[in-house]
Regions:
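Stable alpha-helical elements in mature extracytoplasmic
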Residues: 41-44, 68, 108
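Acidic, glycine-rich loop-and-strand cores that form catalytic or ligand-binding grooves
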Residues: 41-55
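Short acidic/polar micro-motifs at solvent-exposed secondary-structure junctions
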Residues: 55-65
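Small/polar residue-rich beta-strand/coil "junction" motifs that cap repeat-based extracellular fibers
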Residues: 1-40, 46
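Short aromatic/basic micro-patch
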Residues: 39, 66-67, 98
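Active-site and glycan-interaction determinants of carbohydrate-active enzymes
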Residues: 71-91
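C-terminal intramolecular chaperone/auto-processing assembly modules
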Residues: 84-139
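Residue-level signature of catalytic and energy-coupling elements of molecular machines
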Residues: 35, 45, 72, 112
């Protein structure tokens, strides 16, 4: 741990970090304030470009999946989020860009909820149209 309360495990030579249990983050309401509904949802998620790639430093040449930090940062900026904290520079001299992937979970949930509302509205429209077609066919 350094003076800015950051813990760094390894460097670009590290190929894997493993554990026996899932990583957890506190999410207790008592630790939060100024809570509002997240506006980022389907529009945000559909603007992201998921990619597969090989790491330049990867000893194992297995493909990984993710996002390009610079592209994510630009998408957030376009949507008015200049400093969302999800994309940052690390503390190395190279200042590599980092992504807090767990922060994508909330917008993905929001996107799924928005998509479900669209699906339900479309199902209702389809049902109405089918009834109208059936009524016309009976004439």
């Amino acid at each position: 741990m350094n003076a800015s309360n950051k813990v760094r495990i390894g460097n670009t030579s590290v190929t894997k970090i493993e554990g026996q249990v899932a990583f957890t983050t506190t999410s207790d309401k008592r630790l939060k304030n100024h809570i509002t509904d997240l506006p980022l949802g389907l529009d945000f998620i559909t603007q992201l470009r998921p990619v597969e790639y090989l790491r330049n430093n990867g000893a194992e040449k297995s493909k990984e999946w993710g996002l390009i930090a610079q592209e994510l940062q630009q998408t957030l900026k376009t949507l008015g989020y200049k400093d969302a904290g999800i994309v940052t520079e690390d503390s190395t001299p190279e200042k590599y860009m980092t992504v807090r992937y767990n922060d994508l979970l909330a917008p993905m949930i929001k996107a799924t909820q928005e998509q479900q509302k669209l699906i339900q509205a479309q199902a209702k429209t389809i049902s109405t149209l089918l009834r109208r077609v059936e009524a016309l066919e009976k004439k």
